[in-house]
């Protein structure tokens, strides 16, 4: 999965402008529309399903940069 595809998916899911998505974006309710722990896990699940990837170390994901570093291709 390339970073552009991740940004596109992230932007659509969270309804956030692509220009605001940077590696230091903190994934919390101040920055993400309708953020909750359940919604975050739904996002992770949708990401894994749609792109056939696995997210490792989910407990250590606090920023967009953390997210992009922990995506592992299943292929």
What are these regions (language model features)?
Residues 1-75:
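Phosphopantetheine-dependent thiolation modules in NRPS/PKS and related acyl-activating systems
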């Amino acid at each position: 999965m390339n970073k552009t595809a991740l940004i596109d998916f992230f932007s659509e899911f969270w309804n956030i402008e692509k220009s605001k998505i940077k590696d230091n974006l903190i994934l919390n309710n101040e920055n993400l529309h309708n953020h909750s722990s359940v919604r975050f896990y739904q996002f992770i699940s949708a990401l894994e399903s749609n792109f056939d990837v696995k997210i490792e170390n989910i407990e250590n994901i606090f920023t967009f940069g953390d997210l992009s570093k922990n995506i592992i291709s299943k292929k």
